[in-house]
Amino acid sequence: MLVVSGIILTCLSGLLLTGVIGTRFSWTERIGLSFPLGMTLQTVVMALLDLMHIPLTSFSVLSAGAVTFALLMFIVARYRGFESFRITSAMLDDWKQANLVWVLLIILIGYCEYMNFSKCMFFPPSDRDSLAAFDTLGFVAAQDHTYMRMSLFDTDYNPSIHRAGGSIAYAPFVQMSYAYVYILGAETSKSIPALMYLFFVIAFYGILRRNTGKTVAALSTLFMMMAPEMLAFSSLSTTNVMQLSLIHI
């Protein structure tokens, strides 16, 4: 339950952050960007908590997330307004004017995403980078309630990690995102890459839809998903999918 609450809070914060960034996003773009932006913001907040020597517990990270959400609400209300968040009938034009080709493409996109998401959540992390660094560091950070001072970084315990190329030199944000779900009680970190890919697909379609017709946007999205590496990206790699999603967006 805490994991679901944390993910919802992260998405809502990301949704508000799109309102801070600009007012011309479509709802498809806002939804697609909500999780990547929200998780980026959440990991920054967790890093700040760690710098202030506040233990990373479910209470502290959710409380900090709630404070961040309230702050974003204030900024949007004070400086941007909520007019751009209004839901109008024009947003349903794609469905009202749907053609058979577009509907079939959307069904195929949904099936490919379901296949990818299911496989991602079923198989545990298996790639070397995750097991040697990202996933392991996230799990240990959740157990130690800190990233900077975690036991794996102890020179006496693990001297090799301080050598050139050691995982201690990696930017902590991927590991922090994994630690976030582990702190909230998740059994695996695979929900992060699975959701990253899901929201990336939504944002990809939304950005294309802004500049092209709905059928072309759906066809291009399907072609992107069916590329050999992208078809099972999040189910096979728990690290690269996050960087790829953010770079493309």
Predicted stretch roles:
Residues 17, 48, 181, 204-213:
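Transmembrane-helix signature of membrane-embedded glycosylation machinery that interfaces
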Residues 28-33, 186-188, 204-226:
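Transmembrane-helix signature of polytopic, membrane-embedded enzymes
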Residues 100-128:
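Transmembrane signal-anchor helices characteristic of membrane glycosylation enzymes that use polyprenol
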Residues 247-249:
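Conserved small/polar residues in nucleotide/adenosyl-binding loops
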Residues 1-94:
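Membrane-embedded, hydrophobic transmembrane alpha-helices
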